A protein has these predicted regions:
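Small/polar low-complexity and glycine-rich loop motifs
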Residues: 1-204
């Protein structure tokens, strides 16, 4: 491609609503099942679910929210997922059922990401697509290895970062960084033979 000057964008970046969550966890196969006919789900009752985990998400205005997933083993190799949004149970959001292969411990259902809608007070609803495809069920304690939601609040630029491969990023106050370009790098067989000609320019 054409080599040209790198232009670093300045100013703010707008908020981006969360739309996807990649979630990877192991569920303990030895956990006792909870009978939903006698113990209905209640987020305030820890005996009504097996495990829980919270994710931070953002709405279209950049407001921060919390989505908590409550996992309940309901029978052998079957788990139910209920959700709260900012601490409130979501009566209009159906539970997700996770089913695992009894021989391999790998997820067999659902085979595609699940989209869950959460209503906000002032911003557009958050349609969050949750991918459980890499979850497992083995005889070891509940553990989460990936809890990655996209989205972020609006932010101001606060710096520039250059990676080892020459990629140049603008960095922002919300922790995001955006690629601006890449510095052309070259390797010289005799670095000691380089001669400085001006500033950061060298000749061999």
């Amino acid at each position: 491609g054409t080599v040209t000057d790198i232009q670093i964008k300045t100013g703010n970046i707008p908020a981006q609503a969360s739309s996807s969550l990649t979630f990877t966890a192991n569920f303990d196969a030895s956990d006792a099942a909870i009978d939903r006919t006698t113990v209905p789900f209640d987020a305030t009752n820890s005996s009504s679910y097996t495990d829980s985990y919270t994710t931070t998400v953002y709405d279209s205005l950049g407001n921060e929210h919390s989505v908590c997933q409550y996992f309940t083993k309901t029978s052998d190799n079957t788990w139910e997922v209920q959700y709260t949004f900012d601490g409130q149970q979501q009566t209009g959001v159906p539970a997700t059922t996770l089913t695992f292969d009894p021989n391999t411990g790998k997820l067999t259902s659902p085979t595609t990401p699940q989209t869950i809608e959460f209503q906000t007070d002032a911003a557009a609803p958050i349609d969050l697509t949750v991918d459980y495809s890499t979850c497992t069920q083995y005889g070891s304690e509940f553990s989460v290895t990936t809890n990655a939601a996209d989205g972020y609040a609006s932010a101001t630029q606060n710096g520039v970062q250059v990676d080892d491969d020459g990629k140049v990023y603008a960095t922002y106050s919300n922790g995001e960084r955006m690629l601006q370009g890449q510095v052309v790098l070259a390797t010289f067989p005799n670095e000691n033979g380089l001669e400085a000609v001006s500033g950061t320019a060298w000749v061999q």
